[in-house]
Amino acid sequence: MMLRVLVGAVLPAMLLAAPPPINKLALFPDKSAWCEAKNITQIVGHSGCEAKSIQNRACLGQCFSYSVPNTFPQSTESLVHCDSCMPAQSMWEIVTLECPGHEEVPRVDKLVEKILHCSCQACGKEPSHEGLSVYVQGEDGPGSQPGTHPHPHPHPHPGGQTPEPEDPPGAPHTEEEGAED
């Protein structure tokens, strides 16, 4: 009975899991997939604020994809595969931008994804933030406490959760009187 439950729960998960990346193709035995993190200078900006240049990495490479012609009626599964060079490990860093001339909003915090490692992964795969080493680094540098920030503001920091890439928090905040810098 327990074996049926285990097979019933694990087998569908294994079938739905993305296939492993392909490093070689039989048609091109002399070519290999490659994917690496390249150093870049990224400019972080916000309307009405001074932009900052930071060091980051971008994923660059050539991963395999292929599509074998189908038949109708279909006699076998469609043979389509797609890998893309994308972040395999990243962390989030707070970048504070100064907004001179804006008394109500003197600073804006931006969360920036810092790429640590890249690899060939399934194209349709959503960026997985589960199991990633998430550490928010503030202005005080690596010695500062994860999830803390030297300026008080209304938006929460991602203590153990990573914000969704589509909508990272970057809302402006108001400096309180008497707050320490």
From Swiss-Prot:
Which SMART domains does this UniProt record tie to the protein? CT
From the UniProt record, give one GO term of the biological process aspect: negative regulation of monocyte chemotaxis
Annotated region described as Disordered, given as residue ranges:
132-181
Q: Which cysteines are joined by disulfide bonds?
A: C35-C85, C49-C99, C59-C118, C63-C120, C82-C123
Q: What range does the record give for the signal peptide?
A: 1-16
Q: Which Pfam families match?
A: DAN
Decide whether keyword Secreted is in the record. yes
Where found in the cell? Secreted
Keyword entries, A-Z: Disulfide bond, Secreted, Signal, Tumor suppressor
Q: Which domain of life is it from?
A: Eukaryota
> Which residue range or ranges hold the CTCK domain?
35-124
Record InterPro entries: Cys_knot_C, Cystine-knot_cytokine, DAN, Neuroblast_suppress_tumour_1
Subunit (UniProt): Homodimer.
**Role of this protein:** Possible candidate as a tumor suppressor gene of neuroblastoma. May play an important role in preventing cells from entering the final stage (G1/S) of the transformation process.
The molecule here is called Neuroblastoma suppressor of tumorigenicity 1
Q: Could you tell me which species this protein originates from? A: Homo sapiens
Q: What is the lineage of its organism?
A: Eukaryota, Metazoa, Chordata, Craniata, Vertebrata
